[in-house]
Structure formats: structure tokens, C-alpha cells
Amino acid sequence: MEPRDTGISLVLVTRNRESDLTRTLETLKGALCPCPWEIILVDNASDTDMSRVCKASGLENLRFFRTEENLGPPGGRNFGASQARYEYLVFLDDDANFIGEDALVRIYDRMNREPDFAIFAFQVRNLEGGLYNWPHGKHRLPRKDGTFRTKYFLAGGFAIRAAWFWALGGFSSQLFFWGEETDLVLKSLALGGEGVFYDGSVAVLHRVHGNGRVKDEGRFYYQVRNRMYILKIRFPAGISLCYRLYYGLKYLREAVCLGWLGTYRRGLRDSRRIPRKGSCRLTLSRLRAWQKLSK
């Protein structure tokens, strides 16, 4: 990729969420930013014309793109990033918004002050005001408003340096749904990255109740398929087998309880059929570095 100009490209991917998108764009009208910035909006093959939402927003720095097919969240984000002009990529879900007008100011400042890090996680809250899908462990809850190194981020609200994003090949679009965040961090560590920098001073409201997750058979399929794939291609061979046995049995028990054995078998089968793109496998030392990021 060509060198990027100084600034922020805010990437939004939407699909059939006109009202959510309208609200998100409305919140961006008062956003403060200390550098040039743009909004890249990707319509991921919605059933209706989403361009009218963009026109109605009146946002002059918004650029609209539409894909001809549903690329899934990781593919849609990759497409949006490929259109970006600036060196810092910030991703936000279409049903989310920053809490506070100075979020981009904080992001820009943090990324400038932490040159050793490429991936930045934010604090994500739900409609009740609680934390949304806090992945960093209970021991870090007292530091939710502070900073720390971690191995997790939520793709619905995070930032990454464009140069590093493309050095990693972006998100693994072949996953289509679920697990792309973990996969990106594993690729980053495999190539010598420093993990993820969490900045709790940047807050995102994900406009859902609770953790917003509904246990359904479709999600279960992608969990089985993608986790088995990620473990196989990212972890050292022997350790990969141990992890796959553990999760294989875990998902099997779940499938038996829920009556989803057919879906379980299909997920296992399809995990072996996902095409590989590039090779970023952790060494044993980098796997240990990944594990230490949870402590």
C-alpha cells in the first residue's frame, strides 16, 4: 500500500440497519478532531439504498461505497480500509457511537504517544451503562478507565495503524463472521507486534442491551468452524492439537445439550475447507508472549 497522509479514516460498515446508521452519523456531526479526517461508509450489500442516509446526514467528509455482495464484517472492514486516505484507521459499528465529542482527539493523541503499539482497544459500554463483552479479565475491571497491554479488542470500536493493518493482510476475510479480532492479534504477534494497547479514556456506546449476543445455531457454527481453523494455522503444531482437542470436546458437549450435532459436524468439516491466505504462525516464544498479555 502507498504511504498514507497524516489523519484519521473512520470506517463504518453497515448492512440493512438504516435507523441505526442514521443515529450513528448524527452523533458524528459534533465530533472534534485535531487532524484531517474522513468517514468511510461501506454498504455491505444491503437490501435497500443506504446512500440516501448518507446524503441526509449532511456530513461533508463522508465517502460512500457499496459492495455487490455481503463480504461479512471482516471483508467489509477490509474493503473500507482499502479506500482510506489516512494513516490511522478507526473502526466503529453502525449501531455504536463515541461517548464524548473528543474521542478522536484522544485516539489521535494516544496513537502518537505510543509508537510501539499498532492496535488500540477502547472501553465499550452497553445501553445499561455497563461494560459490553469485557474480554480483559475480572482482575482488570478496576482499571477499566485506565490503560494496559492486552491481547483483546472489540472490532466494533478500535484503532490500528494502516501500515500495520496491511502488513498483516487486514482481517482474514475468509472467516466471514466471528473470531477475526483474535486472529488479527495472533497474526500481529507472529510478525513481532506488541499486542494491543487498551485506552479506557476512549469510550464507545454499543447500543444494545447486555452483551447483545443471542445464542443461535448460526453463531455456533461459525464459532466451531473459525476457532478450529484459527487454532490450526496460528498456533505451534503440537500445542495447536491440544487446544483443538479441548475446544472440540467443549463444543461437542454444547452441541449435545442444544441438539446441534449436525451443525457441530459441519463446523468441523468446513474448518478444514477454509482457504489459507498467507502464513502467520506463532513460535513457542510468541505464544508465551500472547498468553502473558492476559496477566
Tell where the protein language model's regions lie, with residue ranges.
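Non-catalytic, C-terminal membrane-associated alpha-helical segments of glycosyltransferases
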Residues: 222-223, 237-295
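A conserved acidic beta->alpha catalytic loop
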Residues: 27, 43-52, 96-97
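A short, conserved alpha-helix in the catalytic core of glycosyltransferases
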Residues: 152-153, 157-160, 164-169, 174-203
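Glycine-rich, basic loop-to-helix element that forms the pyrophosphate-binding segment
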Residues: 67-84
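Active-site donor/metal-binding and catalytic loop motifs
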Residues: 193, 198-217, 226-230
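Conserved donor NDP-sugar-binding/catalytic core segment of glycosyltransferases
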Residues: 101-132
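Short, acidic, metal-binding catalytic loop of nucleotide-sugar glycosyltransferases
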Residues: 26-36
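Short aromatic/hydrophobic "clamp" motif used to bind/position activated sugar donors
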Residues: 89
